[in-house]
A protein has these predicted regions:
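Short, well-ordered alpha-helical microsegments
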Residues: 2-5, 54, 114-115
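ATP-dependent carboxylate/phosphate-activation module, predominantly the ATP-grasp catalytic core
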Residues: 86, 108-111, 115, 119-178, ...
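A short, GP-enriched loop/loop-strand-helix hinge that lies immediately N-terminal to
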Residues: 1-27, 39-49
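Short amphipathic alpha-helical segments
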Residues: 5-9, 80, 119
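A short, flexible beta-alpha/helix-coil linker loop
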Residues: 15, 72-76, 206-207
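Pre-DFG segment of protein kinase catalytic domains
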Residues: 197-199
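Active-site nucleotide/adenylate-binding loops and adjacent lid/helix of ATP-dependent enzymes
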Residues: 27-105, 110-111, 122-124, 152-167, ...
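Conserved protein kinase catalytic/activation segment
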Residues: 193-195
Length: 222
């Protein structure tokens, strides 16, 4: 979507995401590399070319549980959680099966509440009317595939944490070059490190989050 919007905006000389913004927003490794360059807090990550490299990263990070995913897909396609004794060949091949560019990303798994955000940006100023607590209950039947089965809005996070999330979202959007437009944020709250950006898209969410839940909870049809 961002690439299409970028091309249309360029053709008609409209306001829209640049080609570089679209590239960062749709390639998860390039996105996270950009975030590191701009001091945006993210879980540790790296590209893997084999199941052996999954083991190598887990040793370096000193963790048992990690997330593997294609760098170029959305909608949780190819995303799987890897536990300590799981079959690494299966996990790697599962992610690769969904990849269009054959690039596979590994991330440390952060245990903590996850937050979905919807943000409008105008002249570099971000307003985040949508902050929802993600729900993953009753999804063990799908494990190790990660399936979100709902969300609560308004969020139950504290006012201080809400402010921290809003600041993080604005800084992350700025890092991706979004000056005017919208962004969708995936945030995890780490007990030791605070809110971290899992991913950010230069579009709004699919489903009914931005379309229904945010307007209904705020009483504002934005």
């Amino acid at each position: 979507i961002p690439q299409i919007v970028s091309q249309i905006a360029t053709f008609f000389n409209w306001i829209g995401p640049s080609a570089k913004t679209s590239e960062w927003a749709t390639h998860k490794f390039k996105m996270k590399t950009r975030f590191i360059e701009k001091n945006i807090a993210v879980p540790r990550f790296g590209l893997v070319k084999s199941s052996r490299e999954i083991s190598d990263f887990r040793k370096v990070w000193d963790v048992d549980t990690v997330i593997i995913k294609p760098t170029d897909r959305s909608g949780s396609r190819g995303v799987i959680r890897i536990y300590k004794n799981d079959d690494l060949d299966y996990a790697f091949n599962y992610a690769k099966k969904y990849s269009l560019n054959n690039e596979i990303l590994l991330e440390e798994f952060i245990s903590g509440p996850q937050i979905s955000t919807e943000t409008i940006i105008y002249n570099g100023v971000a307003i985040t009317p949508g902050i929802a607590d993600r729900v993953y209950g009753d999804t063990t039947a799908f494990s190790p595939i990660i399936i979100e089965n709902g969300g609560w809005i308004p969020s139950q996070v504290s006012p201080k944490l809400r402010q921290d999330i809003c600041v993080l979202i604005e800084e992350a959007a700025r890092a991706l070059g979004v000056e005017n437009g919208v962004v969708k944020g995936d945030i995890v709250i780490c007990a030791a490190r605070g809110p971290l950006v899992i991913e950010m898209a230069a579009r709004l969410s699919g489903g009914d989050f931005s379309q229904s839940l945010v307007p209904l909870s705020l009483g504002i049809n934005y």
